[in-house]
């Protein structure tokens, strides 16, 4: 059986461009949705053209033109959507419902991977307002997929290293501190940190794998399941210096929600669930899930001490 043809929706974005790269590297005929709304966004256009030079095929279609979406979907076997659900950048998760309708009408798709790539929204029904909107919208998309009997794989990629590791999980910065660091509670709750390129590699490996059909794939490589303290220690070893640590209690952390703008409240809520509640590792993977590093032991995933070296 040949490798699936792949359509990436959101191929110029933070995750999307990595998915495109991984798809091409793994030998898939790779299509990228090119939306007329790109307008005068020269940077996005340059990314698309660079992928075209590498062999990707650009397909013009618009979310405001159902037929164009159906025609685009009919060209491929697998659709991967990477539209942003991050509130401080752009937030388009429910736009995927139009893509679900197109996939349903096209009738040929063997696998759809919607824009997930974070915490498992099925486990976040208790999430704090207003941050729960992200999970609620992802569940709305899931419901539409499953009601339409579209074959799916959901990717739970946990904490992107660029947002959570490079800054030692400090809010309002993307760079690691060199003197003082804020510790969440006792710092012993375990998140999972993932290099974004590894997220893309694991994602592409799932698309033709019968073991991942209609399942959630959790990215939990064992050496990247680290407490906040352990992550900080890796940085301290790299720079040869102990940081001054100040702990913030759960109560005090939640009190910082007051007076913040909407996007910041969403972020604080998500940090609470990750670093105080431990929502990424406080459950066993059930029969409807698989763990990526167990499925694909051949992937030499990036460890966080290795990841942090570039910040030194």
From Swiss-Prot:
Binding site for substrate: 270
Keywords: NADP, Oxidoreductase
GO molecular function ontology, one term from the record: pinoresinol reductase activity
EC code(s) of this entry: 1.3.1.-
Entry annotation: catalytic residues: 138 (proton acceptor)
One Pfam family, short name: NmrA
InterPro entries in the record: NAD(P)-bd_dom_sf, NmrA-like, NmrA-type/Isoflavone_red_sf, PCBER-like
GO terms of biological process kind: lignan biosynthetic process
Top-level taxon of the source organism: Eukaryota
Keyword Oxidoreductase found: yes
Family according to the record: Belongs to the NmrA-type oxidoreductase family. Isoflavone reductase subfamily.
Protein name: Isoflavone reductase homolog
Organism the protein comes from: Lupinus albus (White lupine)
Native organism taxonomy: Eukaryota, Viridiplantae, Streptophyta, Embryophyta, Tracheophyta
